[in-house]
């Protein structure tokens, strides 16, 4: 106990800030001094699972729930007007909005800079978050999980600018439902990072707009169909888009984009119908609009495309933009997805330096193009001969004969190739055998060519 008495108050508060609020409160048994210091802890972590012990069934007992709510109220009352930095509130049972509004209002008034709010109800229920309390000149990071934004009757509140967070830099929306479109970003003039994961709109095929002049990083991931999506984000430098194909992309303003990762979600049935000639399927007809998305990111320097995305681009080859700034291109392959768009894509990257292929095996069609060696044609390798790529990385390599033929194809037709990196799948023995075969192939190639390709072979790693 003598050691505890000698610990400075500031250090004790710092230690308590790493504990959940319940655990920090339990330290009051050590001394009355520690209980008083709880009022000055700058981080609050309120989690009902720690208090209610759901594995023991306590969450289902009303008196236990009420006891926890009373505990939260006492903690906030004890702290009074003391400044607070980080607050995390996580609940798995129903709360009345007035109580939550009161908690949020309390911590915002005390200058909270990071707020994480999660009220995870049952599968078909969502907590409707009010906007009337959301005004703060100190909040820098806000994360919302499994909440509803807007109002059922009309799209006001969050969506009509009733909030104002002038210092907010990071906004994370995880499994959040919207009534209306995403327009409240205008109330966030300093926003730099926006993450939207599994968001959905209660109104069918809503036209969504993401508009913010200061936004630098945008991540969107959703398995829900939507209407059109517009992006008016002129300062964006990083864009990650994992989503079903939108109905349209009317506006894509990303003039300063440096890096993009595009993974479009499609079903097997949609892929099959898209490959059919003159298909008038409503969903398939929207796929060529992906060309508008690609045109909007044409200034990108690093681009990562999924196998689905590459196949979808085959429906908009005629509108494929020239990626004049692109230095690094990474493409994921799949045996059930085609490379039809690969030739025009490579031809439209006049300054490409690094090409990363995550797998070589793909779905072969008569429109597979001249980028691979799958189909015999007179103009073999034409798209490769115009590509200035210097470094070729091949991942998920298994050493099959088909893959070996493709390695030879790349060596024959990439005129500027200087370095070949191959990451081999399989056990050590298989990797060693494949490495020896490839090394011999490179040796023979360098003897018969003016080039001097350097080979790097290793086991596959992320």
UniProtKB/Swiss-Prot annotation:
Pfam families: F-box (PF00646). Disulfide bonds: none annotated. LRR repeats lie at residues 118-146, 148-175, 197-222, 302-333, 334-359. Coiled coil: none annotated. SMART domains: FBD, FBOX. It comes from the Eukaryota. Residues 1-47 form the F-box domain. Keywords: Leucine-rich repeat, Repeat. InterPro entries: F-box-like_dom_sf, F-box_AtFBL13-like, F-box_dom, FBD, FBL60-like, LRR_dom_sf. This is F-box/LRR-repeat protein At5g38396. It comes from Arabidopsis thaliana. The lineage of its organism: Eukaryota, Viridiplantae, Streptophyta, Embryophyta, Tracheophyta.
């Amino acid at each position: 106990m003598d050691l505890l008495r000698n610990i400075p108050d500031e250090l004790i508060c710092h230690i308590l800030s790493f504990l959940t609020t319940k655990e920090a409160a339990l330290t009051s048994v050590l001394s009355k001094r520690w209980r008083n210091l709880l009022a000055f802890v700058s981080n609050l972590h309120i989690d009902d699972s720690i208090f209610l012990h759901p594995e023991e069934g306590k969450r289902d007992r009303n008196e236990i729930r009420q006891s926890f709510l009373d505990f939260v109220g006492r903690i906030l009352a004890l702290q009074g007007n003391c400044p607070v930095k980080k607050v995390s509130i996580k609940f798995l049972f129903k709360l009345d909005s007035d109580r939550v509004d009161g908690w949020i209002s309390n911590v915002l008034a005390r200058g909270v800079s990071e707020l994480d709010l999660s009220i995870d109800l049952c599968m078909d229920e969502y907590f409707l978050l009010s906007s009337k309390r959301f005004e703060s000149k100190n909040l820098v990071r806000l994360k919302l999980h499994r909440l509803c934004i807007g109002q059922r009757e009309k799209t006001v509140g969050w969506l009509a600018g009733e909030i104002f967070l002038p210092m907010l830099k990071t906004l994370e929306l995880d499994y959040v439902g919207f009534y209306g479109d995403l327009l409240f970003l205008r109330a966030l003039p300093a926003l730099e990072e926006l993450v939207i994961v599994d968001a959905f709109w209660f109104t069918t095929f809503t036209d969504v707009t993401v508009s913010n002049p200061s936004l630098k990083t945008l991540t969107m991931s959703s398995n829900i169909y939507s209407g059109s999506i517009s992006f008016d984000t002129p300062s964006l430098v990083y864009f990650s888009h994992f989503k079903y194909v939108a109905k349209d992309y009317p506006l894509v303003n990303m003039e300063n984009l440096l890096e993009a990762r595009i993974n479009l979600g499609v079903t097997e049935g949609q892929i099959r119908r898209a490959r059919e000639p003159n298909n008038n399927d409503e969903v398939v007809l929207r796929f060529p609009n992906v060309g508008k998305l690609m045109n909007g990111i044409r200034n990108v320097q690093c681009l990562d495309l999924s196998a689905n995305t590459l196949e979808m681009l085959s429906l908009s080859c005629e509108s494929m933009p020239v990626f004049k700034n692109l230095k690094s291109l990474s493409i994921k392959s799949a045996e059930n997805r085609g490379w039809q768009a690969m030739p025009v894509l490579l031809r439209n990257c006049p300054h490409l330096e690094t090409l990363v292929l995550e797998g070589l095996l793909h779905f072969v069609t008569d429109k597979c193009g001249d980028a691979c060696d799958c189909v015999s044609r007179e103009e073999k390798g034409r798209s490769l001969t115009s590509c200035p790529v210097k470094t070729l990385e091949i991942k998920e390599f298994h050493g099959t004969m088909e893959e070996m033929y493709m390695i030879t194809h790349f060596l024959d037709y990439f005129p500027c190739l200087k370095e070949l990196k191959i990451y081999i799948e399989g056990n050590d023995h298989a990797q060693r055998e494949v490495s020896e075969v490839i090394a011999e192939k490179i040796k023979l190639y360098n003897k018969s060519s003016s080039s001097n390709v350097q080979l790097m072979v290793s086991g596959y790693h992320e």
